[in-house]
């Protein structure tokens, strides 16, 4: 149990190009907003924080959104323990790409559900919004993931996105351990 108190989590930030994945990650790690868009190939960050009174060492992979780097996706999808599915509320096509990322993660993991959080970034640009909160919430329900809106620029729900993902990983781990414990307790030896 003590290993669970001080644990490393491999988080992966995925989504289309220009949705603010790097801005979200850098705001979380360094409390700094990156104004200029510089396409990422792949960057890795580390941060230690306390989430629900437990120390968490976060190993965050900020991925390329551009299609030309899609060959790298299977590898980081294999190793990630949880995923932030990021789209921009001002970019309809980035929202439409999310089910493809979700499906690809589940295919690579060969599982029906996995810890993921749907993040609608750039919520500060309300006048440029092309994706409503209601339709994003509906997609979250359909994909069986929770949804939140964030603004890397105004630091709205930045910490919440990463912390909620760690909680989702912890809950998934707890759910997979519970049935094993119940099986162990129910074993009985019958002598005939």
Swiss-Prot record:
A motif (Effector region) lies at residues 37-45. The modification Cysteine methyl ester is found at residue 189. Gene3D superfamilies: P-loop containing nucleotide triphosphate hydrolases. A lipid is attached at residue 189 (S-geranylgeranyl cysteine). Keywords: Cell membrane, GTP-binding, Hydrolase, Lipoprotein, Membrane, Methylation, Nucleotide-binding, Prenylation. It is a lipid-anchor. Residues 190-192 form a propeptide. Disulfide bonds: none annotated. It is found in: Cell membrane. Signal peptide: none annotated. One of its GO terms (cellular component) is plasma membrane. GTP binds at residues 15-22, 62-66, 121-124. Ras proteins bind GDP/GTP and possess intrinsic GTPase activity. This is Ras-like protein RAS2. It comes from Hydra vulgaris (Hydra). The lineage of its organism: Eukaryota, Metazoa, Cnidaria, Hydrozoa, Hydroidolina.
């Amino acid at each position: 149990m003590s290993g669970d108190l001080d644990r490393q989590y491999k988080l992966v930030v995925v989504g289309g190009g220009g949705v603010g994945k790097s801005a979200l990650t850098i705001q979380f790690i360094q409390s700094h907003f990156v104004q200029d868009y510089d396409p990422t190939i792949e960057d890795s960050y580390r941060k230690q924080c306390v989430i629900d009174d437990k120390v968490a060492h976060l190993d965050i992979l900020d991925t390329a959104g551009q299609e030309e780097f899609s060959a790298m996706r299977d590898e980081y999808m294999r190793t990630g323990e949880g995923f932030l599915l990021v789209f921009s509320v001002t970019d309809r096509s980035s929202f439409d790409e999310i089910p493809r990322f979700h499906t690809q993660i589940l295919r690579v993991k060969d599982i029906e559900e996995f810890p993921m959080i749907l993040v609608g970034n750039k919520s500060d640009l309300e006048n440029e919004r092309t994706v409503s909160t209601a339709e994003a919430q509906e997609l979250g329900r359909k994909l069986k993931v929770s949804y939140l809106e964030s603004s890397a620029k105004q630091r709205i729900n930045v910490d919440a996105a990463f912390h909620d993902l760690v909680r989702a990983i912890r809950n998934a781990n707890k759910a997979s351990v519970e049935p094993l414990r119940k099986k162990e307790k129910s074993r009985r030896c019958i002598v005939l």
